[in-house]
């Protein structure tokens, strides 16, 4: 027997939607969970296989497994509905029917539309923004900063790269990022590469203790990871942000999604997708 509650995200496509919604709901409860995603459950046979996997994994548990579903096909979903061994939460059943009544229009019941290539132009924007973020990651090149919607600035390991990539993929934002070096932190002026793009700058900072922990995992017992060095770099970076009037955000306890959404909001960026 176990106190851990098993949670499964079951979908007829990638499972991203079921996972995102289900995880958001579960974070509202102080319970220990073991989570798993079962994607591409698009036939009754696959649904039965998924059900066998779920019930087998939970056979010794005190409570039935919780299953979040975004399956569209009624026949496939029926396999899960008929089971007495799971607690099923179907997102589409919860929201689609009320929306159909409100909008007075039947839904299309199209599988995978939220994460498929429904619009070629949107897909192209995401790919172009991703390429831009990759080419302008970690100060690799400053050549096309003029195209950037935002340039994230901060010390090493302060979340710049994942935030840049998420902004590109999720919102189609052209995000570059610039790492503050020792020379940049010693100087009393803005780095030369950033001077003409001041309006696009957005700073990311982090608690020195957390930075020390992250860097120690990457380079243990190095000067780079020393707490004193982390404290110095964070203090100098924040002093630069204040001196130069650069808006900045403490990302210590924030997820990548929260960081990106906050940058969008505070910097008044226009999302392309």
UniProtKB/Swiss-Prot annotation:
GO terms for molecular function: ADP binding; ATP binding; phosphotransferase activity, phosphate group as acceptor; protein serine/threonine kinase activity. Its EC number is 2.7.11.33, 2.7.4.28. Keywords: Kinase, Nucleotide-binding, Serine/threonine-protein kinase, Transferase. It catalyses: [pyruvate, water dikinase] + ADP = [pyruvate, water dikinase]-phosphate + AMP + H(+); [pyruvate, water dikinase]-phosphate + phosphate + H(+) = [pyruvate, water dikinase] + diphosphate. InterPro entries: Kinase-pyrophosphorylase, PSRP. It holds the Pfam family Kinase-PPPase. ADP binds at residues 154-161. NCBIfam families: PRK05339.1. Bifunctional serine/threonine kinase and phosphorylase involved in the regulation of the phosphoenolpyruvate synthase (PEPS) by catalyzing its phosphorylation/dephosphorylation. This is Putative phosphoenolpyruvate synthase regulatory protein. It comes from Halorhodospira halophila (strain DSM 244 / SL1).
